A protein has these predicted regions:
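Bacterial Sec-dependent N-terminal signal peptides
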Residues: 1-21
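Beta-propeller blade repeat segments, especially FG-GAP/WD-type strand-to-loop junctions
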Residues: 20-21, 63-98, 146-148
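Blade-edge motifs of beta-propeller repeat domains
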Residues: 19-33, 88-108, 203
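Beta-propeller blade termini
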Residues: 36-45, 109-122
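Short consensus segments that form the blades of beta-propeller domains
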Residues: 30-31, 66-76, 133-139
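Acidic/hydrophobic-patterned starts of short beta strands in beta-sheet-rich repeat architectures
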Residues: 45-57, 119-130
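Acidic, small-residue rich beta-repeat scaffolds with periodic aromatic anchors
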Residues: 113-218
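N-terminal targeting signals for Sec/Tat export/insertion, comprising classic cleavable signal peptides
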Residues: 28-53
Length: 218
């Protein structure tokens, strides 16, 4: 009986270890759990001249993956966001891991994706997009802009865009938390109407850190 429990615990520890991100590695394939889908980008986020890494990785827990009649698989696992910073040793070192802030797919007809990018200035952009294959003509996306400062990552802005595929109506609401300004731009991609822009002041608030709120498409 003791041997059984020892083997069971050892197998559990091995499985748990296989699902962990490595603390250091050379690239995303080296540090992520085997079999996880990923979208990774490289860039200098902390201004030290070294190339860092930001990645969105989706687990492959089979209990949360369904296969449709056409053979396509829907993955309902919650994605994980990881940020690695490059060290003097040339390796990537885990800076932060965020397990619960990204949106997971909840319906077969609604696809939710989070795509990372890094700007030339080193800002991290996380774009959350929603596409409904039925029930809605509107496609929406929200871009969150983050900046590394004071040894952490802070949200400095957000762009919310919506497009009605049937009418061409488009609206983009851009918020800059550094200047406390909001710009709403409305246009029509079909009628090619002149864009209308409306500025608004936002209340001054302390910047939120990455991880302090969920990244949703709103």
């Amino acid at each position: 009986m003791k041997r059984f429990f020892f083997v069971a615990i050892s197998l559990f520890a091995l499985c748990a270890s296989a699902q962990q991100f490595k603390q250091t590695g050379t690239d995303i394939d080296d540090v992520k759990p085997q079999g996880w889908m990923h979208s990774a980008v490289m860039g200098d986020i902390n201004g030290d001249g070294r190339i860092d890494m930001v990645a969105v990785c989706t687990p492959n827990d089979s209990t949360k993956i369904t296969k449709r009649d056409d053979g396509f698989c829907d993955n309902f696992n919650q994605p994980v966001l990881v940020v690695y910073v490059a060290g003097a040793d040339g390796k990537q070192h885990l800076f932060r891991k965020y397990d619960t802030i990204l949106s997971a797919r909840v319906d077969e007809s609604i696809d939710v994706t989070t795509i990372p990018s890094i700007t030339k200035k080193g800002n991290i952009v996380l774009e959350v997009s929603t596409f409904a294959s039925m029930g809605s003509w509107t496609t929406t996306s929200t871009k969150y802009v983050f900046r590394y400062q004071n040894s952490d990552i802070y949200c400095i802005g957000k762009d919310c865009a919506s497009v009605a595929r049937n009418t061409g109506e488009r609206e983009v609401v851009s918020e800059n938390y550094l200047t406390a300004k909001q710009l709403t731009t409305t246009s029509n991609e079909v009628k090619k109407k002149k864009a209308k822009k409306v500025w608004k002041n936002l209340p001054k608030k302390a910047l939120q850190k990455l991880g302090e709120f969920n990244l949703e498409n709103n």
